[in-house]
Design a protein with these regions (language model features):
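Short, surface-exposed "cap/lid" segments of acyl-processing enzymes
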Residues: 1-36
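Short, flexible/disordered intra-domain loops and linkers
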Residues: 16-27, 150-153, 184-189
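Second-shell loop/turn segments in exported
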Residues: 19-24, 33, 53-62, 142-145, ...
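Alpha/beta-hydrolase active-site loop
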Residues: 29-33, 55-78
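Conserved alpha/beta-hydrolase
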Residues: 34-54
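Primarily recognizes the serine-hydrolase "nucleophile elbow" in alpha/beta-hydrolase
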Residues: 73-133
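The feature captures the conserved acid-bearing segment of alpha/beta-hydrolase catalytic domains
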Residues: 109-175
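C-terminal catalytic histidine-bearing segment of alpha/beta-hydrolase fold enzymes
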Residues: 166-213
Length: 213
């Protein structure tokens, strides 16, 4: 196994994982690509919302940082391989918070995809999650065809620059299919719908460059 990825879904964060492992809401990019990641040799830990409550506005709070600490500690019981954190849209706020909370050397890197960088209904962005405290390598992925107003691809360089103590890289992609009229839907260019294999492959190449095996 190459490593384990902590996956933080976007939106309200509630994917409704059942006790038997079934996932009721699996449209989100970091959830629906779990099998692609498994084929590439990565274990995946999908982080669900706490008590099925919306995570909007909670991901950058100190209370949630304590939860993230518990998640990191749990992940270390699963593997001694490189540990990653990946989030998409609102979930990128959580991934950024993991990166800024982790101890030195604890994470191999963080991946932020279609990150919320403009304040919307949640009232928080990746800039509220203390990006200056991130020390692990970071990848900011931005789809030039994403038209979600709270995640403009043009701000990707600004997100990377905010992680001033990290070796942060920006990856631009293009394409995707809009199955939903909502530009912030998982089933749109915002969620890499239709280009999942390409995006996962691009991210995986960066990850391998960070931790060659």
């Amino acid at each position: 196994m190459r490593g384990v990825i902590l996956m933080f879904p976007g939106g309200a964060g509630d994917v409704d994982i059942e006790r038997d492992g079934a996932i009721r809401h699996d449209n989100n990019f970091v959830v629906r690509t779990r099998e692609l990641w498994a084929r590439l040799g990565y274990g995946v830990v999908i982080v669900d919302a706490i008590g099925h409550k919306s995570m909007r506005g909670e991901r950058s709070t100190e209370a949630y940082r304590q939860v993230l600490r518990e998640i990191l500690d749990y992940a270390h019981t699963l593997t001694d391989r490189p540990l990653w954190a990946m989030g998409t849209s609102q979930g990128s706020i959580a991934a950024m918070a993991v990166g800024s909370s982790a101890r030195d050397g604890e994470l191999a890197g963080i991946v932020l995809t279609e990150s919320v960088s403009v304040v919307g209904h949640s009232g928080e962005t990746v800039f509220d999650a203390r990006p200056e405290r991130v020390r692990a390598p970071a990848l900011v992925v931005a789809n030039r065809d994403d038209t979600c107003t709270v995640a403009p691809p043009s701000r990707a360089p600004e997100i990377a620059a905010a992680m001033k103590n990290s070796a942060a890289t920006v990856l631009h992609v293009e394409g995707g299919v809009a199955q939903s009229s909502n530009p912030c839907s998982s089933l749109s260019p915002h969620g890499y719908f239709g280009i999942e294999k390409q995006v996962v492959g691009d991210i995986a190449r960066w990850m391998r460059s960070v931790t060659p095996q």
